[in-house]
């Protein structure tokens, strides 16, 4: 009989995954393996989404297996767009299940919110390492939610920017962000003000219509587009999507789930894993967009790191 699975809370996960920077090296390997097809040993179907139309939400199921890691996980994630700003329940909630791949036994049930925030930010940092213009000085973050914090953390660890700007739909949340994070961040009153002249832009909003327009973006800038994870949602306008060199985490997922890609008709140039492998170039001299939908193999890497760390210290 298998032993009882361990439960790792958000605090436990945070203890064993203190920085997104810990994920960068293993995630680069996982991205390269994913983009290697069957030879990479990653089995990852596109996420299954169950709409909950009555309550304006959905449930997503994201399984993955990696032969290189010999790890098997699935993440259950919910998103409810009408949550109140004063609600104690976040708009996104996630739980990750880690299995023993040799026999299917459940090893751990762990909070997935910290994992999602940190692995997403780490992948954005990987994309930025390859795609940002040389001598980037200005970082702009659009949005002030959980992902804004995790991105700020890893970006200020991995890169040096002379100026960091933030814009958020509600100024109060931008002020909270500025008063919470270390370092100096300038609040901007409009998206246009925030992005003008920025070298690296991160969009982590709940927008369903474009908020970032190509005419505002500095030629050669790099954009990490994190929000708009449904086929009818967008953060970026047609002009930006079509003028930029477009990179994605998964081409299959982007062509099924990304409104930014589908509604603009933009052509995907490469998966990020292909750039990591060196089989596709990083056009850092051009305007680039990395459209991140998030992948189950990323959750798997983070969950295994957390579980291995917990196991070694128990």
Curated annotation (Swiss-Prot):
Catalytic activity: L-pipecolate + NAD(+) = Delta(1)-piperideine-2-carboxylate + NADH + H(+); L-pipecolate + NADP(+) = Delta(1)-piperideine-2-carboxylate + NADPH + H(+); L-proline + NADP(+) = 1-pyrroline-2-carboxylate + NADPH + H(+); L-proline + NAD(+) = 1-pyrroline-2-carboxylate + NADH + H(+)
Keyword field: Cytoplasm, NAD, NADP, Oxidoreductase
Pfam families membership: OCD_Mu_crystall (PF02423)
Domain of life: Eukaryota
Binding site for NADPH: 91-92, 119, 144, 146-147, 168-170, 173, 205-206, 292
Top-tier EC class: oxidoreductase
Cellular localisation: Cytoplasm
One Gene Ontology cellular component: cytoplasm
EC annotation from Swiss-Prot or TrEMBL: 1.5.1.25, 1.5.1.1
Record keyword NAD present: yes
SUPFAM superfamilies the record matches: NAD(P)-binding Rossmann-fold domains
Main location: cytoplasm
Annotated GO biological process: thyroid hormone metabolic process
Family label: Belongs to the ornithine cyclodeaminase/mu-crystallin family.
Role description: Catalyzes the NAD(P)H-dependent reduction of imine double bonds of a number of cyclic ketimine substrates, including sulfur-containing cyclic ketimines. Under physiological conditions, it efficiently catalyzes delta(1)-piperideine-2-carboxylate (P2C) and delta(1)-pyrroline-2-carboxylate (Pyr2C) reduction, suggesting a central role in lysine and glutamate metabolism. Additional substrates are (S)-cystathionine ketimine (CysK), 3,4-dehydrothiomorpholine-3-carboxylate (AECK), and (R)-lanthionine ketimine (LK) that is reduced at very low rate compared to other substrates.
UniProt-recorded name of the protein: Ketimine reductase mu-crystallin
Protein species of origin: Bos taurus
């Amino acid at each position: 009989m298998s032993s009882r699975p361990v439960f790792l809370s958000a605090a436990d996960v945070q203890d064993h995954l203190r920085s997104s920077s810990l994920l960068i090296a293993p995630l680069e390997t996982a991205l390269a393996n994913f983009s290697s097809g069957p030879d990479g040993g990653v089995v990852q179907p596109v996420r299954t989404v169950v709409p909950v139309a009555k309550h304006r939400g959905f449930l997503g199921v994201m399984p993955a297996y990696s032969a290189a890691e010999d790890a098997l996980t699935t993440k259950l994630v919910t998103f409810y767009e009408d949550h109140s700003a004063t609600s104690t329940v976040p708009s996104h909630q996630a739980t990750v299940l880690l299995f023993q791949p040799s026999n299917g036994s459940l090893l751990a049930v762990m909070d997935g919110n910290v994992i999602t925030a940190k692995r997403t930010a780490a992948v954005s940092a990987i994309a930025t390492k390859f795609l940002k213009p040389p001598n980037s000085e200005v970082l702009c973050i659009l949005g002030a939610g959980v992902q804004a914090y995790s991105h700020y953390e890893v970006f200020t660890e991995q890169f040096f920017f002379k100026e960091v700007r933030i814009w958020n739909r509600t100024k109060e949340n931008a002020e909270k962000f500025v008063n919470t994070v270390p370092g100096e961040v300038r609040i901007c009153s409009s998206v246009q003000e925030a992005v003008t002249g920025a070298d690296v832009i991160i969009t982590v909003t709940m927008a369903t219509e474009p908020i970032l327009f190509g005419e505002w973006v500095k030629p050669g800038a790099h954009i990490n587009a994190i929000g708009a994870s449904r086929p009818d949602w967008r953060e970026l306008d047609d002009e930006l999507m079509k003028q930029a060199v477009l990179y994605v985490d998964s081409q299959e997922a982007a062509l099924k789930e990304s409104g930014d890609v589908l509604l603009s008709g933009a052509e995907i140039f490469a998966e990020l894993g292909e750039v990591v492998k060196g089989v596709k170039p990083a056009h850092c001299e051009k305007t680039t967009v990395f459209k991140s939908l998030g992948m189950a193999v990323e959750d798997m890497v983070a969950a295994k790191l957390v579980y291995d760390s917990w196991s070694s210290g128990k």
